């Protein structure tokens, strides 16, 4: 597939077939030793895509109230894809992060603030120097409340950009969450295991105005 083709989402009919077996990952989070799969009572899940998932995962695991994070693939068609398959542009997935958080400590709105303020949501099928559909900006809400908050935050951030003199349209995809597939274990908490590894995310200098 050419670089040009990788800038256009594959159709479900043309996506790779994938496999039934999930990627094996460590049982515990490498940073905080919490479960990588379980969701404790009272906690909630959020999914965000904002470029290379190595830096994105670190961004969120550092937030108070976040119980665990995981790198993976979302928004596509191919079941249990490999990293190489996702990078081919033939699965439809974005590199995404699964966040398990305690809403009594950190609100979904605060996660949205971290999302908007730490990447460029105007770049379409790329993020910085990373090109391809897997690097697109996306929010995958799980509930009507998350969906409403995501759309409202996009409107506020677009207005804040305009007020700052930036009139580029936001290209962030907001779509109901489809299955999330864990990435290979080598990608989990990558920047903890490789402190000098690549991190290509960065904001545009605009802050998300608070919700009403």
Swiss-Prot record:
The keyword Oxidoreductase applies. One of its GO terms (cellular component) is cytoplasm. It comes from the Bacteria. This is Peptide methionine sulfoxide reductase MsrA. Pfam families: PMSR. It catalyses: L-methionyl-[protein] + [thioredoxin]-disulfide + H2O = L-methionyl-(S)-S-oxide-[protein] + [thioredoxin]-dithiol; [thioredoxin]-disulfide + L-methionine + H2O = L-methionine (S)-S-oxide + [thioredoxin]-dithiol. Gene3D superfamilies: Peptide methionine sulphoxide reductase MsrA. InterPro entries: Met_Sox_Rdtase_MsrA_dom (IPR002569), Met_Sox_Rdtase_MsrA_sf (IPR036509), MsrA_MetSO_reductase (IPR050162). NCBIfam families: msrA.
């Amino acid at each position: 597939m050419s670089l040009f083709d990788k800038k256009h989402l594959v159709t479900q009919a043309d996506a790779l077939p994938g496999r039934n077996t999930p990627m094996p990952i460590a049982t515990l989070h490498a940073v905080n030793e919490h479960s990588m799969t379980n969701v404790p009572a009272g906690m909630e899940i959020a999914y965000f895509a904002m470029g290379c998932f190595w830096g994105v995962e670190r961004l969120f695991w550092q937030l108070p109230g976040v119980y665990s994070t995981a790198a993976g693939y979302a928004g596509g068609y191919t079941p249990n894809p490999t990293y190489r398959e996702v990078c081919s542009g033939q699965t439809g997935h974005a590199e995404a992060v699964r966040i398990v958080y305690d809403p009594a400590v950190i609100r979904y709105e605060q996660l949205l603030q971290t999302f908007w303020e730490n990447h460029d949501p105007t770049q379409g099928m790329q993020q910085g120097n990373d090109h391809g559909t897997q690097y697109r900006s996306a929010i995958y809400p799980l509930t009507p409340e998350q969906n409403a908050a995501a759309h409202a935050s996009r409107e506020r951030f677009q207005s804040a950009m305009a007020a700052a003199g930036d009139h580029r349209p936001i290209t962030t995809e907001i779509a109901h969450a489809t299955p999330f597939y864990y990435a290979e274990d080598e990608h989990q908490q990558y920047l903890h295991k490789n402190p000098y590894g690549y991190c290509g995310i960065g904001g545009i200098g605009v802050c998300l105005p608070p919700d009403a």
